[in-house]
Amino acid sequence: MKNKWFWILSIIIALIVTYFTAVPKNETDTRKEVTVWTLQMGDFADYMNNIISKYESAHPDIKIKWIDVPFSEGDKRTLAAILSNNPPDLINLNPDFSAILAQKGTLYSIPENKLSEYNKDIVDSLKYKGNLFAIPWYATSAVTIYNKKLFEQAKLTDMPATYEDLAKYAKQVKVNTGKYIYLPTITENDTMLKILNKYGINSYSNINNNESVKVFNQFKSLYQNNLIPKESITQTHREALEKYMSENIVFFQGGANFLSMIKDNAPNVYKVTDVAPQIKGKLGQNDFSLMNFVIPLKAKYKDEALDFGLFLTNKENQLALAKRTNVISTNKEALTDSFYNSYDGLMSKARSISAKQISHIQPVMRQSNNQKDINTLVNTAVQSVLLNKDNTQNILNKLAKDWKNLS
């Protein structure tokens, strides 16, 4: 009897096992998997996942695979992916590296009519040979951060608006306060090139013209007369910020995000801090930094990537990100929002100024394949001029020749 029940139970178990192994638990996912890379957005996972969830609900045939990449690995991993046969469909990059990839012919050309809702100046900055290579996401634009107490002690009556103004007021500041007017980080990366671009100087063909000599000599005069710190020849934004927080300089150029650092690390200085528009050159345009999305030419789902990219960067989603991070939207409608056009504090004032500056950025500085080498040449020339190693014209003539040889 026991054997009989044992065999019956064995048959039942076998039938159950056969049933569940014969019928798959899940049907195959037939959705298109669009791979999206972002840079350093891990702290905003809830923001990204909410957008992805909304998009997938509206597009049941699409699955978004989101991967966040550290800033330090962005260029390297992107280059490796671009060279492979299976790159991500949508990649978050800075415009400089994006432009280099566009020059190499590795990016999908985005139809310009798809970006009619975005800031035109920014869209125009994302073109190579007339072809649009990226979707703008968010931007920042430096403002002039200054110490009101030192401003008054220096007996200044007008805010400096140009580099010429800074040079003009430098001695007055030094005499009345014993402090420096600012620390120009003119040998940091492409800082000097960005300044020169504000005077229409942007290539080896005009780096040694009269206007360029004048700009270089202006910094030379400040340096030789001890009206800017001697450290200007080597130091970066980090050291300039430290000098501002220790009240050794009156003015500091930086994004609104630096205000948070000042507030946290030098609260007494923050109490006497105010902001004004960015320092300009002869042409009157503003510098800006941008994050954008590109679509590799080898991407499997280019149309789907473009559609998701446009959704991710629409007015609603850009404003939601801006309210979390204080960045500047690139969507024209978003920029008309009261978030950018009214303020009740220092942070919001800086944001409002930055947002207005985004509409005046042309001509932008164009990056080259060998930009780091060009930066090195220019920064070496800056040091030679400041140290008076030769007359400025000779130094710039050599710079023009060396730059041309790189091209």
State where each predicted segment sits.
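Conserved N-terminal structural module of periplasmic/extracytoplasmic solute-binding proteins
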Residues: 1-98, 158, 280-283, 303-304, ...
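Extracytoplasmic/periplasmic substrate-recognition and gating elements
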Residues: 53-58, 63-65, 224-227, 264-328, ...
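Extracytoplasmic "Venus flytrap"/periplasmic binding protein-like
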Residues: 54, 59-121, 149-154, 161, ...
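Hinge/lid segment of periplasmic solute-binding proteins
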Residues: 94-143, 165, 175-177, 270-279, ...
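A ligand-binding cleft/hinge motif common to bilobed small-molecule-binding domains
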Residues: 98-100, 255-270
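Periplasmic solute-binding protein
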Residues: 99-106, 122-159, 184-204, 287-295, ...
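Glycine-centered hinge/linker elements that transmit conformational signals in sensory
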Residues: 170-172, 205-236
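C-terminal capping/gating helix-and-loop segments adjacent to ligand/active sites or protein-protein/ligand interfaces
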Residues: 348-404
